[in-house]
Swiss-Prot record:
It is found in: Cytoplasm. It catalyses: Hydrolyzes single-stranded DNA or mismatched double-stranded DNA and polynucleotides, releasing free uracil. GO terms for biological process: base-excision repair, AP site formation via deaminated base removal. This is Uracil-DNA glycosylase. CDD domains: UDG-F1-like (cd10027). The active site is at residue 61. GO terms for molecular function: uracil DNA N-glycosylase activity. Excises uracil residues from the DNA which can arise as a result of misincorporation of dUMP residues by DNA polymerase or due to deamination of cytosine. It comes from Histophilus somni (strain 2336). GO terms for cellular component: cytoplasm. Keywords: Cytoplasm, DNA damage, DNA repair, Hydrolase. Belongs to the uracil-DNA glycosylase (UDG) superfamily. UNG family. The keyword Cytoplasm applies. InterPro entries: UDG_fam1, Ura-DNA_Glyclase_AS, Uracil-DNA_glycosylase-like, Uracil-DNA_glycosylase-like_sf.
Length: 223
């Protein structure tokens, strides 16, 4: 099983999935602004193929500010200032990874292309309304994504930040995957244990131990 199409393609035929797409389409057609744009809703899967996944970082729902979201958890489009949670992720990286330099942008495509699946548990949101699509059915789909990664792949690293992600990943088999948990990097909770969690170096330690290529967490300084 190498591709997302092989792994979860059948989900797209399921009535619940068709219902999600209908609800999102209706919201767009009613004139509401929905993020990310239609062509970027599934960017995480396009940029990180199923057999290339080495690390999974779970987010919640997309950023709901103007032109921030582009389909990757925690990432923003070029030209958009890194949001507070991402600023804190960079802070932790700068203390955890020797030589890490904080980029001026928040565009995390460089991680996605190395096998870091940046997966939000809900894939769409209405502008200015956090969690507005939380009941659309996306959670069923992303549960299935995590389930198939858990079953069909070995030696993945799951980074679960905050109670929502931890609850979502509670069924992951800890005997064949590495599961790292901490509080969410949001300014509300980062000081409770996200700072100092060293998840990025621990990820590479685990990958190295299993003779897998480490992640180069350094991003280009500018985009």
């Amino acid at each position: 099983m190498n591709t997302w199409k092989e792994a979860i393609g059948q989900e797209k035929q399921q009535p619940y999935f068709q219902h999600i797409l209908q609800q999102v389409q209706q919201a767009r057609q009613s004139g509401r602004t929905i993020y990310p744009p239609q062509e970027e809703v599934f960017s995480a899967f396009r940029l990180t193929e199923f057999d290339q996944v080495r690390v999974v970082i779970l987010g919640q729902d997309p950023y709901h500010g103007v032109n921030q979201a582009h389909g990757l958890a925690f990432s923003v489009k070029p030209g958009i200032a890194p949001p507070p949670s991402l600023v804190n992720i960079y802070k932790e990286l700068s203390t955890d990874i020797m030589g890490f330099q904080t980029p001026s942008h928040g565009y995390l495509v460089g991680w996605a292309k190395q096998g870091v699946l940046l997966l939000n548990t809900v894939l769409t949101v209405e502008q200015g309304l956090a969690h507005s699509h939380a009941n659309f059915g996306w959670e069923t789909f992303t549960d299935r994504v995590i389930h198939v990664l858990n079953e069909q792949r070995d030696h993945l690293v799951f980074l679960l930040w905050g109670s929502h992600a931890q609850k979502k990943g509670q069924f992951i088999d800890r005997t064949k995957h590495c599961v790292l948990t901490s509080p969410h990097p949001s300014p509300l909770s980062a000081h409770r244990g996200f700072f100092g969690c060293r998840h990025f170096s621990k990820t590479n330690q685990y990958l190295r131990h299993h003779n897998l290529t480490e992640i180069n967490w350094q991003l280009p300084m500018t985009i």
